[in-house]
């Protein structure tokens, strides 16, 4: 395993937010509606983790350090873990585990459908984020994992629909997402010398395994 301490550091850092929020809920420090706070916090954390995951490839190309790619899959799985926690909090505190209420919620809040589609996309990526799936799917694996761009769009739309009264924070995340997408365009990449240059043999070895 390459960069074990770096992997461990990323793992511990990703644990901090959920552990802290759950602890805050345990000691009743999240205000009068802790369930709503947890749903919102885990939802936002999912979007942030998705953006962090998408930034690994540009960072590797910019710096030439393969460590960014090494933790990309780990970060992607953390993104999925966050969205599972987001949906779990929603089922517990908003629905009260009453699936009959879900139909009412879907009619009143159609942005939930958008969020559910994003979840299904993340589920597909999480299930196939292993070497067996890479070998099994071949060239189709990369095409499947381009779903991350669609998922980002769905996540931003989901957030926009919820916070449209105050779009300042949304605009920040949307701007970061747009910037990361621009860095994927070959014409843009070639205009930035470091991004267009060779990333080194070490990074090539971990490109598909990170």
Swiss-Prot record:
Its BP terms in the Gene Ontology are: protein repair
The record's keywords, sorted A to Z, are:
Cell inner membrane, Cell membrane, Electron transport, Flavoprotein, FMN, Heme, Iron, Membrane, Metal-binding, Transmembrane, Transmembrane helix, Transport
Keyword Metal-binding tagged = yes
Stated membrane topology is: Multi-pass membrane protein
- Signal sequence, renumbered to the chain: none
Instruction: Please classify the protein's predominant subcellular localization into one broad category.
Output: membrane
What is one term from the GO cellular component aspect held by the record?
plasma membrane
Q: Which cofactor does it need?
A: FMN; heme b
What's the domain of life for this entry?
Bacteria
Q: Where is coiled-coil annotated?
A: none
User: Per its UniProt record, what Pfam families does this chain match?
Assistant: Ferric_reduct
Where are its TM segments located?
A: 8-28, 37-57, 75-95, 110-130, 147-167, 169-189
CC cofactor note = Binds 1 FMN per subunit.
Provide the GO MF annotations for this entry.
Answer: electron transfer activity; FMN binding; heme binding; metal ion binding; oxidoreductase activity, acting on diphenols and related substances as donors
List the InterPro entries hit by this protein, alphabetically. Answer: Fe3_Rdtase_TM_dom, MsrQ-like
Family, according to the entry, reads as follows: Belongs to the MsrQ family.
| PANTHER family, per database record | PROTEIN-METHIONINE-SULFOXIDE REDUCTASE HEME-BINDING SUBUNIT MSRQ (PTHR36964:SF1)
| Cited function | Part of the MsrPQ system that repairs oxidized periplasmic proteins containing methionine sulfoxide residues (Met-O), using respiratory chain electrons. Thus protects these proteins from oxidative-stress damage caused by reactive species of oxygen and chlorine generated by the host defense mechanisms. MsrPQ is essential for the maintenance of envelope integrity under bleach stress, rescuing a wide series of structurally unrelated periplasmic proteins from methionine oxidation.
Assembly mode: Heterodimer of a catalytic subunit (MsrP) and a heme-binding subunit (MsrQ).
**Protein name per UniProt:** Protein-methionine-sulfoxide reductase heme-binding subunit MsrQ
Species for this entry: Pseudomonas savastanoi pv. phaseolicola (strain 1448A / Race 6)
High-level lineage? Bacteria, Pseudomonadati, Pseudomonadota, Gammaproteobacteria, Pseudomonadales
Gene of this entry: msrQ
């Amino acid at each position: 395993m390459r960069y074990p301490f770096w992997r461990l550091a990323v793992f511990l850092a990703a644990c901090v937010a959920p552990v802290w929020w759950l602890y805050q809920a345990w000691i009743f420090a999240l205000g009068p509606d802790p369930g709503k706070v947890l749903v919102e916090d885990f939802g936002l954390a999912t979007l942030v983790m998705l953006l962090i995951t998408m930034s690994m490839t540009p960072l590797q190309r910019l710096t030439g350090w393969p460590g960014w790619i090494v933790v990309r899959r780990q970060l992607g799985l953390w993104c999925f873990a966050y969205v599972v926690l987001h949906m779990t909090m929603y089922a517990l505190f908003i629905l009260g585990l009453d699936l009959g209420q879900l139909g009412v919620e879907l009619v009143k809040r159609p942005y939930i459908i958008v969020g559910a589609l994003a979840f299904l996309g993340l589920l597909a990526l999480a299930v196939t984020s292993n070497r067996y799936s890479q070998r099994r799917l071949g060239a189709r694996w990369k095409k499947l994992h381009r779903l991350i761009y669609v998922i980002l769009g769905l996540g931003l739309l989901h957030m926009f629909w919820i916070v449209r009264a105050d779009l300042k924070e949304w605009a920040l995340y949307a701007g970061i997402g747009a910037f990361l997408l621009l860095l994927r365009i070959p014409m843009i990449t070639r205009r930035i010398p470091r991004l267009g240059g060779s990333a080194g043999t070490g990074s090539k070895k971990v490109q598909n395994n990170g």
